[in-house]
Amino acid sequence: GDVYKRQGEEIKTNVVFYNFSEVGQNETERVVGGFNHYNDVLVGDVQFLSNNIAVAVGENVISIYKIKEYPSLEKEIQIDNTIDRVFFGTDYIGLVLDNSDSGELYKMVVYNFSGSKVCEAEFGTQVDNIQFDGSSVVMNNSTSFSVFNLKGKNVANMSFDMPASKVLPTGTRGEYILINTKYIQNIKLK
């Protein structure tokens, strides 16, 4: 979890790991690791992506922790642009960054759990939903839908006649369910 401590006028972030198994019972308050190197960066989200991997998302940093019995900081990724959104898959971490200073409005960057960059792509549309669908990234807003592969290539775009509230992957490659206020529709990409 994250703990914010006030020191004078500064706010310090500590990321603390607890272990409630037998390993943690010998530790004070079951704390098996703590990291306080974030200085003045706020860490707003910590996600466990598996039993062995946790990701801490700060204002301008992504920290990947490997956890065996005790956590260790595996990789830290410094982010130059403002992080607009973070999304997670079974094998990947995705970021949507503000890119308005250079080119399109947004940049999507995908990393694997080792912290290596897999791909990046720029796009100009505000998105309401973005998610991984296997080896693709699916994004939509109320009027359009796009699919990117993990090479950063835009492989599909679609516009909607009626505003869509959600586009859901079905688990079959290239097949999605479009939901709006009047109907649910299956979409198959060619």
PLM-predicted stretches and their roles:
Residues G1-Y4:
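Short, small-residue-biased leader/transition segments that mark boundaries at the very start
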Residues E10-N19, N60-Y65, S102-V109, S144-F148, ...:
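Structural motif
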Residues N26-H37, P71-Q78, G115-E122, K153-S159:
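A short beta-strand motif characteristic of beta-propeller blades
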Residues G34-L49, I79-D91, E122-S135, M162-G174:
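Repeated scaffold domains used in trafficking and secretory/extracellular systems
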Residues A56-N129:
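Eukaryotic tandem repeat interaction scaffolds
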